[in-house]
Amino acid sequence: MMTAALTGISPEVIRELKSGKSRTLELQSTHNVVTLARVETGTMVFMTSVDMEDLMAGDPGIIVEVELISISMKRIVEFALGMHFEERERMSARIKVRYVAPSTVRSATKEEITQPTMVDVIKSSCFHAG
């Protein structure tokens, strides 16, 4: 299954999602925001703690369903020595996701930073001997 990939996600967040609860995340990494700009509600997305530069076949992660998505611009205001400096704006994406299944990367497509990160993934199977 070819899908968008969100990389560098905290292992704690992935572990919490695996417990079955929907969770709202705020992502600020440029590559993740660019990827989410092309994702629609209801889409399945791959999430992994592996960094974008290191993503390759065999890397583990999870498939999540995007329930809500919002991309917005925020102003960053910093204070130093009692002076006010408006330094920059920051774009961020807030997404509400729900865990679907464990998954493994079959292949990864890495283009430019301005293009979404795409992966071909397979759902992992788990069998218990009884």
Q: What are the residue ranges of the model-derived segments?
A:
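Compositionally biased, charged N-terminal/linker segments
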Residues: M1-T41
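Amphipathic, positively biased hydrophobic alpha-helical segments used for protein targeting
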Residues: H31, E53-D54
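Beta-strand elements of well-folded, non-transmembrane domains
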Residues: H31, S70, A101-S103
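Short coil-to-beta transition motif at edge beta-strands of beta-rich domains
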Residues: L36-E53
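Aromatic-rich, lipid-facing transmembrane alpha helices and their immediate juxtamembrane interface loops
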Residues: R38, D51, D59-I62, K74
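Hydrophobic beta-strand residues in large extracellular and virion-surface proteins
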Residues: G42-M47, V66-L68, I95-Y99
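Contiguous surface segments at macromolecular interaction interfaces
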Residues: G58, I63, I76-G130
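Short, conserved beta-turn/loop elements at beta-strand boundaries and strand-helix junctions
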Residues: L68-V77
